[in-house]
């Protein structure tokens, strides 16, 4: 085993462990001494609380061992101990623990990291609020003078507020008309996913929010009375002790609807109130710098969701589940609207004795009297002179009837529609209109009647304006559900169909050209293709049922609830046409009329598919029947094509550098192609939480997109594991939403010619090719790599962690690399501190480029300074390298690897260690820093804290995994030479629980699962 020491450096001793999910950095860059002191002060408070809770909850001897283990994680604590290393002391202490103490240690360190995460979120929130204050108070006269020697805006990738971006644009003389055109067509869509599911239980997350709230109260007041301070501290200790006694692990595998409920929390607690604030901040900043520009609609930023609708590889997502998900979402929105309208009714106490009322509102009240005579009889006397309250009473009744209708639909299911809704007479025709709201426009029209009446009397109501903004953004649906399914499911279903129909040639036997010809022919006929009353295979029946459910969903909820169908592993044009044909069969697509209520979205994932994508789309754009079914957008009413780019599988296939470059090139080629056909393109970025899956700072990633590819439109996945860190607190949510929006505005309005520099593109193509070759030589061509990964990482135990409704592998029973999903692939490497998918291959590629021509190093430095795309790549690699711990990684290998494969595994480890050294050397030379993350002192402070504290969890995990995997031998917690073996035996369930708790703790420390 490689032992660490305080003097160790380079590959064997990493410099840091990032405090945020693989590159998600706080706003402050570089940091200030004041911020550092604030962090240190708050850190002391949290550490003191943690120690107090451990001493209260654990037996004295055990608590002292845990505190000693924490102390030993700091190398300076061992100075003067006869040269004994930190690792040796930690191993010695772990060896002396029984399983109950090991479990307590895993829980204690997990609690510690989660408290630190809460602390840092609060500091990031405070930093964002501080950044808003100067822009609000600063006017043109006091603004800092424009610096002509500053880097061009196209090269600036620091996050910016609305005020900062609009000021920069004005100083660059960007015309108001150009800004207004962009804002009018601004279309930002954030899509929440369940996978990788956040490892923290929903119950624990609730307790974390309570702790965060108490910490904010304790730290927000500079001079609290002593009693109040002591009371807040007592409440904090009480809440953390309750947290300590709460089970961190899911007792049962969460269902899809559990994941839906967890996701809806962020909308209920944060986003419903945050989104109107986002628009107000945009409007305020815009009015200062571009006073003549019309404000954008509230729906410039909306939400989607895959939770309950992503069925790719998840058999638990059935048509019934998707139907109930839609009902859950609508239920939440109706409950929120009911609360808002009740509050509004309390506020709008305007009497007709003292204010005029617009005639349209009075006319609507007369119509409502006919529709709802019971309400009129109940409320008319009370609100006889208060028309706004009376109107809002009618609105409340309709909302409550809509909620009842929604409950009926949820209970009945998609195949059994509820009883016909109650109706009311309209213009003397009985039963002409439903009493409940059948569309969001009806609700919005009622609210606008009230607003227009207020405006006509020179009154305004911010609460009403806020509600109208929320209605524009969320509708009744809350978020649009994207259906996602793997391409072969459709081709298999059509193959079974054509076999049943006894076509001369079954679909599965056709070549691609034959498939396309047959699909286009069928699309042009009105003849039904799928016969009724046929007993299909289970998979085919499910595929057909999804489209039937979609049709029913749109009929009841409107198109907004679900209008995108994502086809994962798209390879050819037939993959898209298959979905169109199945949609046509059920009435979602009508080629004869040129109408479609479903947008077919290909997802290109592998490098080969990314390279093939332009040719595939070119053929489809030239096909009239396909092009005519694209929806129209924008002032020019261009046909819109949404297209998704996959980061996860392309990285798993070819490595980090190659994947990112191929995606970059594909975007340019696809945008050029779409423009040549007069098609508007909306790129959907399937970004994960980790660097290897496209994660990292969203603002940096958006600014790194090729110039001209956004044009105000972007769609991005927000992975389950990062939702809490981005949307768990109101100001953090606003910070994330504001920086995403400003990045889209900046990228769309400021032309970046650097993407078109031929020499830079040629260099990137070379290094991407070299990186891919080196990555594939290890990951795909080395016959021992799969065994190495399965033995040296906790991948098998990860599959037993009850955090997700989706299986870890695509195919049951398969144990090869291709069957493993990208998320557990990354999770396994992260837990064992290799983090290989996020950096391997980069060092060799860059080193070979510099070795061929030493002057290329200067070019690489210029790229890092001037090109946002290259700076993003290096920044992500730098952040990932700071998390790598080769000492600990080698301990995983030597302790968990099969002794018979030791030589092969040592060879693999040497390849990894050598590549780490090359990558570290080149990154430091390119950035000009002497150590990783050297440009941000505050980040380093947090990084060093996590780096020294997470180590014991790694040793604990290895000890528990060894026992778990070899119960016959029952090895001790550690095998230090000369120590007697621990003969205690434990059940498999006890050992598995301990191992899973270490997974929890390390994920909390790394703030990342997959």
From Swiss-Prot:
Residues 1-18 have a biased composition (Polar residues). GO terms for molecular function: magnesium ion binding; phosphoenolpyruvate carboxylase activity. The active site is at residues 195, 652. SUPFAM superfamilies: Phosphoenolpyruvate/pyruvate domain. Its EC number is 4.1.1.31. Gene3D superfamilies: Phosphoenolpyruvate/pyruvate domain (1.20.1440.90). Forms oxaloacetate, a four-carbon dicarboxylic acid source for the tricarboxylic acid cycle. This is Phosphoenolpyruvate carboxylase. The lineage of its organism: Bacteria, Bacillati, Cyanobacteriota, Cyanophyceae, Synechococcales. The gene is ppc.
